[in-house]
Amino acid sequence: MVGSGAAGSASSLQGNGSNSSGLKSLLRSAPVSVPPSSTSNQTLSLSNPAPVGPQAVVSQPAGGATAAVSVNRTASDTATFSKYLNTAQALHQMGVIVPGLEKWGGNNGTGVVASRRDATSTNLPHAAGASQTGLGTGSPREPALTATSQRAVTVVAGPLRAGNSSETDALPNVITQLYHTSTAQLAYLNGQIVVMSSARVPSLWYWVVGEDQESGKATWWAKTELNWGTDKQKQFVENQLGFKDDSNSDSKNSNLKTQGLTQPAYLIAGLDVVADHLVFAAFKAGAVGYDMTTDSNASTYNQALVWSTTAGLDSDGGTRLW
């Protein structure tokens, strides 16, 4: 994702992530050794991780020199806890600050926040003029939340309590409370976290963090195709990205950078999840992109892609221009 470099709000959305399909690792953190029987509180520096006991408390120092995360676990949570620490390390390597997570106490046993506006304004800092809805900058506006969409967007405070649903995880998911001055938006859908506007990866439009089920590690990879929505929507997003890639291989994921195209056609000004649909808003014309498929017989081979309008994309309804 092309980074805007401006401070923004992180619209943190929850899912358990345990049903994510195996993903190829573009950036993989080193394993973290977690002893099964320690009871002391220790501080973990993500830049220099150390073994952590059942009560891991990591603070975020002034100036953001070290990313931080606070996670509570029991002795039986060793494997899952290690997975979250690996996720935090990967995020830190990408320049994303993981704020301290407080133990989630729930709300009447449900863990559901009334509205995302309340959740984001209470738990995460906002830049001046930044939207609290995840739909780009401008006047904050709250979309109507159905029972389904509310479940998808209300996780800023932490995960659901253990035992509330089949999607509950006993540990806080470090992905649910992310903030960085150059990370404008986050969204969660179908077991994947979409991270846009990271200044540390300026040659790519957006990234997805997922969990490799085989290794249990968090993996970073360039998301160049959406796995949900219609074919029309997928084609539109692939065009916006400037190239098409149907695989998650490291070589193809780095195709954009290695071929010298560092500015895709549009900048995505915002994204959100509403009623279980991923919504991109305010594509802005910025440059020329190319479909970099290696198949010379493809209809879009080396096709130049240029736009001069502002367009929106809904994963349910396709594209619309205004």
From Swiss-Prot:
Region annotated Disordered, chain positions: 1-59, 118-145
InterPro entries with a match to the protein in the record: MgpC
Residue stretches of biased makeup (Low complexity): 1-48
Domain of life the protein comes from: Bacteria
Bias (Polar residues): 120-134
Family affiliation: Belongs to the MgpC family.
Protein name: Putative MgpC-like protein MPN_367
Organism in which the protein naturally occurs: Mycoplasma pneumoniae (strain ATCC 29342 / M129 / Subtype 1)
